[in-house]
């Protein structure tokens, strides 16, 4: 198992939790982004810069991830594609996407896209709360413990 991060929009606090977990457990952690992302100096932590462009980082994650890996991303279509490959997907708010929940999340996302396209202002996501940060860290710990890392 290794952890892949859709790092372009990943909050700094989430990256810090991931760096601590990777340092503590030795799990391989790769941040994928279309710009340089600084990472701690450790053999198991790296940053992968891809070309700028729509979904280039997402496509790289799909290509490189394997069944049993963990991807950190809030990108719902990416999560759906990864779940089909039996990759676990955890969003930065601590929600683990599953086969049972991803279809509903895709429907909500598509509905919001339709509203935005019709000119309705929907706003963006709220900043991460302390509760969500804690939930992310707890969920990550549960996943790593289950994998016995």
Swiss-Prot record:
CDD domains per the record? PIN_YqxD-like (cd18720)
**InterPro entries in UniProt:** UPF0178
Q: Which Pfam families match?
A: DUF188 (PF02639)
- Residue span of the signal peptide, if any? none
Please report which protein family the annotation says this sequence is part of.
Belongs to the UPF0178 family.
UniProt-listed NCBIfam families = PRK00124.1 (NF001095)
Protein name, per record: UPF0178 protein VFMJ11_0615
């Amino acid at each position: 198992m290794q952890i892949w991060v859709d790092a372009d929009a990943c909050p700094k606090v989430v990256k810090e939790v991931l760096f601590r977990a990777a340092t503590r457990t030795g799990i391989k952690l790769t941040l994928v982004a279309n710009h340089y992302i600084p990472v701690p100096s450790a053999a198991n932590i790296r940053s992968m810069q891809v070309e700028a462009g729509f979904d280039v980082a997402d496509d790289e994650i799909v290509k490189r991830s394997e069944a049993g890996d963990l991807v950190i991303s809030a990108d719902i279509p990416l999560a759906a594609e990864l779940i089909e490959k039996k990759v676990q997907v955890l969003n930065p708010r601590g929600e683990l996407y599953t086969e049972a929940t991803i279809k509903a999340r895709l429907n909500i996302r598509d509905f919001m896209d339709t509203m935005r396209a019709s000119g309705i202002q929907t706003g963006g996501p709220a900043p991460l709360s302390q509760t969500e940060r804690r939930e992310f860290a707890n969920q990550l710990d549960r996943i790593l413990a289950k994998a016995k890392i």
